[in-house]
Amino acid sequence: MNRRRRIYEGKAKILYEGPEPGTLIQFFKDDATAFNKKKHDVIDGKGVLNNRISEYIFTHLNKIGIPTHFIRRLNMREQLIKEVEIIPLEIVVRNVAAGSLSKRLGIEEGTVLPRSIIEFYYKADALDDPMVSEEHITAFGWASPQELDDIMALAIRINDFLSGLFLGVGIQLVDFKIECGRLYEGDMMRIILADEISPDSCRLWDIETKEKMDKDRFRRDMGGLVEAYQEVARRLGIINENEPPRGSGPVLVK
């Protein structure tokens, strides 16, 4: 690992130079962060679960024609991805009031929204990722109007797919965050899904009990994060049904 050239290190992942031009290796760390790194811990086994859950989701998105950077999983913690030019925005899709939306607008957590809402946040840790409007995005050149249309169309399709996927295993998709990038292929450029989709980037509640099965368990000091992520993976059929929840080294289905 040390011999490879490190391209970028974020809060939960490291990007290394890939084996072929136009590819990168995405490594999933066990680091858990919240509130823009103000809260930090290392949780054994988290990266392995996020790698597998994100692989599962991106593979299904690719199959239904939603373009992503995912090529294939390499091992327990790494996947091969296409190199993209990341658009400096976090795109949040909300179906149920929770988190900052509840605080900002005084809406009780758990309130189903009249329709899905798409929000944009400028990726800048020093500024705590401020919420921005479409006007800000186009005025400052972070994305063009056409790119924004493409991003929103992707976000809506991803929301439709994920909502159905999770509903089928007894999980409510409250909200989720995605990132997109520009993929250059010869003279052509298109917007594709990048980063990851995992319980780190989604709010997932058990439909029956409303039990939180996502990173809010870390944000709110609830404990049981790995067990919750394992339960998500188990329901999706990613890890062995008979494997008891435990803090490290989950047995994975090949």
From Swiss-Prot:
It catalyses: 5-amino-1-(5-phospho-D-ribosyl)imidazole-4-carboxylate + L-aspartate + ATP = (2S)-2-[5-amino-1-(5-phospho-beta-D-ribosyl)imidazole-4-carboxamido]succinate + ADP + phosphate + 2 H(+). GO terms for biological process: 'de novo' IMP biosynthetic process; cobalamin biosynthetic process. Its EC number is 6.3.2.6. Transmembrane segments: none annotated. PROSITE patterns: SAICAR_SYNTHETASE_1. The keyword rRNA-binding does not apply. PANTHER family: MULTIFUNCTIONAL PROTEIN ADE2 (PTHR43599), SI:DKEY-6E2.2 (PTHR43599:SF3). This is Phosphoribosylaminoimidazole-succinocarboxamide synthase. It comes from Sinorhizobium medicae (strain WSM419). The lineage of its organism: Bacteria, Pseudomonadati, Pseudomonadota, Alphaproteobacteria, Hyphomicrobiales.
